[in-house]
Structure formats: C-alpha cells, structure tokens
Amino acid sequence: MGTRSTSVSDAVAVLDERSREIFRRIVEGYLESGEPLGSRNLSRLLPMSLSPASVRNVMSDLEELGLIYSPHISAGRLPTQIGLRFFVDAFMQVGDLSAEDRANIDRQVRAESGGNPVESMMNEASRMLSGISRGAGLVITSKSDPVLKHVEFIRLEPTKALAVLVGDHDQVENRIIELPAGVTSSQLTEAANFLNAHMSGQTLPELRKQLSQLKDDVRHELDALSRDLVERGIAVWAGSPDEGKPAQLIIRGRANLLEGLGGAEDLDRLRMLFDDLEKKDSLIEILSLAESGSGVRIFIGSENKLFSLSGSSLIVAPYRDDDDRIVGAVGVIGPTRLNYSRIVPMVDYTAQLVSRLSRNPL
C-alpha cells in the first residue's frame, strides 16, 4: 500500500497516545544513533505494554501516513522528512538555556579580541556553533551600507581630488577621483554642499536613487562641471572593492559533516552542499530565509531548495544592527539528524549575543 502525504494537523488528529509514543521513540532513536528501530526493540522501550505484533501494526499506520519508512526489507523504521517536520513542530520541546550554557557561549564568542574584534567574534561564534552540533557552524555577515553623514572633496593636484565620505558611525572612506578639466575650487565646494544637502539619513544606494529622480533639480542647481563632479564622486564609491559582495560566509566544522558518511552517495551529497555554500546566491538565500520569520528558522531537507540535493538541514537566526535592521545570520548546517532541541536555543542565544556585541565590539 502506498503512503499518503500528511500535514502536522492531520497527524495530530489521527494519532492516538500509543502511536505518538512509538513515533516519538523512532525519531529520537534516529536522532541519537541514525539507526532504524524495529518492533521488538520498541516493545521493550515503550512505557505501555505492547507486543511486537501490535507495534508493527502501529508502525504500518505511521508508514501509511508518510511519517516513517523502512530503509530495507525486514528492517526497522526511520522518520521521513515529513515525519521529522512533524516531530519538530509537534513534539520537540525547546527550553531556556541554563545560566552555565549562556556563560559558556559568552566566553567562547568573546575568546578572541585582538586584531579585528568583530571578525574574531564572528569566527568564534561559528566555531562554537560547530562544537555544540554534529554539523558546521556558520555566520553570514552582510555588507551593510552606512548611513551617510558628510562628504568633502579635497584637491590633491590639478586633475585629481580626494573624495572623503563619512558615515553615521564616523567610519571614513577615501577615494581618489579624476577631476573634470577646468573644475575650480568653488565647484568642488558646490558639489560637496549639494550632496550634503541631499544625503542626510540615507545610504549610498538610496542617495543614488534619489539623485536619479532629481535630475531636473541637479540641472538647475549645478553647472555642468559640478554635475559631472557629483556623478564621479558617487560612481567611485559605488565602484568600491566591496560592491557586489552582499555577504561573506564564515564556516567552521566542515570535518563534522564527514563523520558517519554511508558511502559514495553520501560523499556526493556533501560535495554538493559545499559547492552550494560557495555560491554568492546561496548566501543571499540563507539571509532571506533568516529574514522570512521572527527568531530561529528550521529547514529540513528539501524544504529548503538550496540544500535539497544534499539532504541537509539548516537552523538559522538573524542578527541585527543598532537600527534593528537584519545585517547577518548565524546557524548550523548538518545532516537531518541534528539535535534540534539542543541546537535551536543555542542558535537563538548566539544571534542575540552577536547582535549586542556587533553594536558594541569587544
């Protein structure tokens, strides 16, 4: 008899107490060992008295619902992807972290403070998440555009000037630009004043968009050389080395994913996962997944098209900047038999900690 797909609400309505208990034991056994559980072992584990034959009947019902399957003839049962989702949504209990767990995470994430404190913090967060899971810990840092505060053009020589851009947190970017032939010092000042009048509270992409919408105002307020200077200044910042790099991936614990591989097929899936992680579009996709809901998101197997071929699970949560904007994500990628109830609260707390520390670096 073929299986039929089921939803969490369908399964909750259909399953009685013993069915739920048998299903829960099968999933917990899989998450702990990766091995299928048979009816004889299950009958010994259950709190109620059931014969192996009765257990097999329940397992048959669970298999028809699409919650479990048999990997081999006459073998025990393993949860399907639908079954894992049902378990996570209906059975998994996620408690608060203990004070000791929080202190350990704090200590590990803050472990390195030399050099670049923020980069060190991100590396430690990724390493720590890898250490608490059977997967790889990841941190995605997005290239956030600073809110603009001030711009100035400083002539260096007749044909070159230094364009100085100051952000709202006093970060400074300098670029050398080629000057239009014949530009005067007053035109440098005029171009800077025009940009300063329009940039308040905006990022560079926002300013660029606004100026394209104010072409008539630019034409009326500035002469041709000053307009050229404004366009060159914006163009040189837009052409910075970070342009086109919306995110950076920090990943630790890849070796964890090599453990327990079942053969060439598993190795191929792992290779596909690593290939996916190297793609820029993948980082954008993970960030969008983190942004698509509040708190921690759990994606199991093909629920996430990004990792559907490798059959991996992703547990991810966003972190935010001073303005409560999502600027990155932390999480764990690994096999579907991750310890979800243990990892979810740790990913959640780590995201909160990274949010706090990225606002106030070590």
Curated annotation (Swiss-Prot):
Pfam families: HrcA. One of its GO terms (molecular function) is DNA binding. InterPro entries: GAF-like_dom_sf, HrcA, HrcA_C, WH-like_DNA-bd_sf, WH_DNA-bd_sf, WHTH_transcript_rep_HrcA_IDD. Keywords: Repressor, Stress response, Transcription, Transcription regulation. The keyword Transcription regulation applies. It comes from the Bacteria. The keyword Transcription regulation applies. Disulfide bonds: none annotated. GO terms for biological process: negative regulation of DNA-templated transcription. Belongs to the HrcA family. Negative regulator of class I heat shock genes (grpE-dnaK-dnaJ and groELS operons). Prevents heat-shock induction of these operons. This is Heat-inducible transcription repressor HrcA.
